[in-house]
Amino acid sequence: MPNKNNEDWGGYKGYLDINEKLMVAIVKASETYKKNADAIFRNYGLTFSQYNVLRILNNSPQGKNTITNTSRIMLVSGANMTGVAKRLEKDGFIIRRSDINDERITLLEITPKGKQTIKNIAHEKDALIKMFLNGFSEEEKMNALEDIKRIFKNSNAYR
């Protein structure tokens, strides 16, 4: 992206090929969304990761899921997930317990406080998403989602 505003960027021209422009645009949009969403979640005493754990549990059967499944859905390590879960439990948003059939498995369960917090956040979060997707038709959203899924699938093949 050439510097169209003639701002002084220390000589940086920003010339990228179309492939890199696309990837940079995706990252910028993602980071901008995350920054804005973080501000919303912070008002409720949550980080982005903590909110996502609550969202996953709230949409799991009986509000429960294993710590392993939750970390896989979020694409984070088990160790990181353990820290996030401990903080959520300390603040009363979830309960952590061992599975009665296999004590090696840790179950996470959303509490009424966690469910209420998800409800309280919904309006602000939905308004933010609506702002980001303003002007996109449902078809354009579906096409963009499919395209981004393809990019993500290709990224998994790279590893």
Give names to the regions the model predicted.
Residues 35-77:
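N-terminal helix-turn-helix DNA-binding core of bacterial DNA-binding proteins
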Residues 1-14, 139-159:
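C-terminal regulatory/oligomerization modules of transcriptional regulators
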Residues 5-8, 86-145:
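Charged, amphipathic alpha-helical coiled-coil/dimerization segments
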Residues 25, 52-56, 116, 143:
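Pre-recognition alpha-helix immediately N-terminal to the DNA-recognition helix
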Residues 67, 85-86:
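Short, hydrophobic-biased segments on the C-terminal half of alpha helices
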Residues 1-44:
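N-terminal leader segment of winged-helix/HTH proteins
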Residues 27, 55-62, 122, 149:
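Short, locally clustered residues in the helix-turn-helix/winged-helix DNA-binding domain
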